[in-house]
Amino acid sequence: MPPSSTEAIQDLIDVVSRLRDPDGGCPWDLEQTHASLVSYVLEEAHEVADAIRHGDDAHLKEELGDLLLQVVLLSLIHI
């Protein structure tokens, strides 16, 4: 049985938290800042918009996932 939406979101948060963990996390993820991620967020937002404009629901689902990943990553970077 697939996880509920709430469980899936928590799983994503857990994965990104591990990537950002100072003890063994991913070096690339650890060095990211809000400012360094701006271009990635904009790119994903444009890809979401393109999928909407083209009526490509399958691609939209994929791009929304990519944008959500960026939102979670941004939210786990402490200000």
What are these regions (language model features)?
Residues 1-59:
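Extended low-complexity intrinsically disordered regions
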Residues 70-74:
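Alpha-helical scaffold segments in carbohydrate-active enzymes
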Residues 77-79:
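Conserved small/polar residues in nucleotide/adenosyl-binding loops
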Residues 62:
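Short, charge-patterned binding micro-sites
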